[in-house]
Amino acid sequence: MTNPKVFINPKSGSIRLTGTVDIVDSEGNVIETIENPKFCGCGYSNDKPWCDGSHKKITKPALTLENARLAKTAIEPFAPERAVAIQIREKLVSARTEMNESIVGLKIGGALESKENQTGAMIYGYLTDAMDVSQGLVAADYIYPRAEAEVVFKISKEISAPITIDQVLEHVDQVSVGMEIFDYRYGQAQIFSNDAIADNAGAATFAYGEWINASMNVFDNLQTSLLSNSDVIETAPLSAIRGNPWEAIVQLSNLASRQGLTLKKDWIIFSGSATKGVPMTSGSTYAVDTPGLGVVTVQAQ
């Protein structure tokens, strides 16, 4: 058997072996046999000490996005492919759950597919318990925060397959008024669907009001307003949400099913916005007022 050759990159410190290499455990049992492995020590690969290609495509972009969030500094979009964008999102969210945050639901969003393809795409991002800002927020903790007026659904029975609008009340028993604060880590740069997906659909923080019982006509003829310091900035009918807010759940069930995601019991789902996003600044109070559904207020420090 020919011994593998070793190349050490003096700049990066990575080690590349040429030939067939057995990876063994502490007892000498072969775990995996690989050809020409590279051991970079970067910590970016998917739970392996050698590079599997994921560090450049998936984990490093996720780390870049997370660092941008923590540093409140915008980064440039990097236009990943769709499948890679989804994996970046999952890696980004797993970093938060590893810090003991719990997933409590999803936010629905939308983005154009590309500069050439102006078709709108439904996307979603995960919400965690640490994103709840019902007690107020600090505007300086964001890059370019914007508030949106939304509807919030509470899942009463898990959704693991596509459902129809006639089935929504079997899975949602309560609804509320919601304010989503979104904050893409790309700042004010124009982005398209894949960058949006990678950045967890811009999910930043949220707040919602008191729950009320759901019914098929609960949203009929309702108007919502987004206010800043008691001044109405945006107004829209709830029908601006996909023609009927219930359609948000129907369409999400299809998208989640295609991606192998189950909407879990007790999750909250933010519908996507009825209004344009309103930039948030320190010292202002923001409210979403939807008569017939409720009011939610967030103070920005």
Model-derived segments and their meaning:
Residues 1-44, 48:
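N-terminal pre-ligand scaffold of iron-sulfur
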Residues 25-26, 228-229, 290:
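Structural motif
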Residues 46, 274-278, 292-295:
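Short, charged beta-turn/beta-strand-edge "cap" motif at the junction between a beta-strand
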Residues 49-61:
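Iron-sulfur (Fe-S) cluster-binding segments and ferredoxin-like electron-carrier domains
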Residues 64-243, 285, 293-301:
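Catalytic-core "active-site belt" of small-molecule-metabolizing enzymes
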